[in-house]
Amino acid sequence: MSKRYRQWVEEYQDQAWTVARYILKDAQEAEDATQEAFVKLWNNQDKIDPERIRPWLMKVTRNGCLDRLRRRRDNVEFDESHMAGEASGPLQGASANETGVWLKRAITGLKEPYRSLVVLRDVKQHSYEEVAGMLELSLAQVKTYLHRARKQLREQLAEVRP
């Protein structure tokens, strides 16, 4: 293993795993996705600009996770009526835990890249610049997509809590 590659693994492994974990919602699957991303890095290390390793790796990790979600969705049918039944009713008087559960479901229900952006920016509290770098989006895209994602969350809240 080259010294340069070993340094990249040490420097970016935790960040890649964090991105994978929040997209996939499964620690073991996130570990597998992270390993796959680093295998791709190993196979392409001579083709990648060393100054762009982090954004390249975060994008490969994200795309690999999205592929896994697509495969998972193809294999398991999602029961929307069950989710809707659990989340019905006003949130007024709901405990913080119930509100947290509702919010987690709402975030999970967002499509990519909205879900990743909300998790990285609002939950993990990364800066806009860090999120842009991780997902290889422009700063303007990050802000626009976050605005849309938050609007969707507000609309969902308004449906549950008039």
Features from the language model and the residues they span:
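DNA-recognition helix of helix-turn-helix
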Residues: 135-159
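A short, charge-rich alpha-helical start-of-domain segment used by transcription regulators
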Residues: 1-18, 28-31, 42
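Structural recognition of an alpha-helix C-terminal capping motif at a helix-to-coil junction
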Residues: 32-39, 43, 51-63
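Residues within helix-turn-helix
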Residues: 28, 129, 140
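Acidic, proline/glycine-rich intrinsically disordered inter-domain spacer in sigma factors
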Residues: 81-108
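A short pre-motif secondary-structure segment
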Residues: 117-121
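Residue-level preference for hydrophobic side chains embedded in well-ordered alpha helices
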Residues: 8, 12, 16, 37, ...
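Arg/Lys-rich amphipathic alpha helix in sigma70-family domain 2
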Residues: 59-79, 96
